[in-house]
Amino acid sequence: MAGEIQLNGTSFASESSGTITVNNGTLGSSVVFPAGHIIKMEIAHDSTQKTVTATSYAGGSSTITNLSVTINKTFSSSKILIFCSANLSVDTSGNGGGTACARIIRGTSAPYTEIKDFAGVVTTYDPGAISAVGASAFLQCEDTTTLTGNLTYHLEIKLAGSAAFNAKFSGDNSGDFVSSISAYEVTQ
């Protein structure tokens, strides 16, 4: 049996063959979403090359890439799920192997909060035929902070060990090596 719900003479919802359709309306701020629902999503892309020679995370412009995303978190109980697809390479100038590390950090200025350190995310061996070997690294982590409002996440890179190599992000500024980072607010 088909039917409808009216509020002040306006059809709000209708039912037909077991399917309920909400016709009009806006969800208010007191709506509670079931756990696991994605309620916000932001994504950013970057192809600006960055060369890093640091062997430790400096938390500044020497190691933080231009790849960042800001999400306006609504609920303190939500988690933020972060996905990052980063084009990374290690330039060893033909001198064997090298390893690049990456981490996701939160903040707009120092001190930053580390969300996840992906140690040794790209390891290369260059026998001398080429000077840089790279890969696309897919990084994923979650932030369980109770903070709300604008949260900004960055990709930071460094070299492993003390080798005098270069860790490179996103290729050659041609736009051919685009990396991305996305943030999702997930209800709990």
Positions of PLM-derived features:
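Glycine-rich, low-complexity segments
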Residues: A2-V52, Q188
